[in-house]
From Swiss-Prot:
Gene that encodes it: rplS
One annotated Gene Ontology cellular component of this protein: cytosolic large ribosomal subunit
Coiled coil: none
Protein name (database record): Large ribosomal subunit protein bL19
Domain of life: Bacteria
Keywords, ordered alphabetically: Ribonucleoprotein, Ribosomal protein
Provenance organism: Helicobacter hepaticus (strain ATCC 51449 / 3B1)
InterPro entries cross-referenced by the UniProt entry: Ribosomal_bL19, Ribosomal_bL19_CS, Ribosomal_bL19_sf, Translation_prot_SH3-like_sf
Membrane-spanning residues: none
Function: This protein is located at the 30S-50S ribosomal subunit interface and may play a role in the structure and function of the aminoacyl-tRNA binding site.
MF terms (GO), sorted A to Z: structural constituent of ribosome
Length: 118
C-alpha cells in the first residue's frame, strides 16, 4: 500500500508525458537531452529495446545498439525521465521473450530481429 500523496504525485508525473506503447524487440529512436556547459542539445540513440522492468513512474527500459567496431552499447533509461526528450518506435519486432539478453552474445546477422507483419 503506497502513501496517497506519493501515488498522486506519480500519477501527475505520468500524466505530464506522452509515451508511445512499445515492448521488447522493438527498434526505438530516443532523443536524449545533453547538457554541455550552458547549452542543451538533443542526441539521438537508436537501438533495440531488450528489456522493460518496473511499473508506474519507476518503469525503466534498456536499449542496445551495435556501435563502432562491433562494440555493443546498452543504455538504461527511466521511462518518465526528464532527460528523455522523445521516444519514437521505428520497427515492431517479432519476439517470444520479454527479456532479450541473449542478443548480448550474438553478432552480425545472428543478432537481427524479424519485423512483425500485419
Amino acid at each position: 500500500m503506497r502513501n496517497r500523496y506519493i501515488q498522486s504525485f506519480q500519477e501527475a508525473q505520468i500524466g505530464k508525458k506522452q509515451v508511445p506503447q512499445f515492448k521488447a524487440g522493438d527498434t526505438l529512436r530516443l532523443g536524449i537531452k545533453i547538457q554541455e556547459g550552458d547549452k542543451t542539445r538533443i542526441q539521438h540513440f537508436e537501438g533495440v529495446c531488450i528489456s522493460i522492468r518496473g511499473n508506474g513512474v519507476d518503469r525503466t527500459f534498456t536499449t542496445r545498439k551495435m556501435g563502432a567496431n562491433n562494440i555493443g552499447v546498452e543504455k538504461t533509461f527511466p521511462l518518465y525521465s526528464e532527460s528523455l526528450d522523445s521516444i519514437e518506435v521505428l520497427r515492431i519486432g517479432r519476439v517470444r521473450r520479454a527479456k532479450l539478453y541473449y542478443l548480448r552474445s550474438r553478432r552480425g546477422k545472428a543478432a537481427r530481429i524479424k519485423e512483425l507483419r500485419k
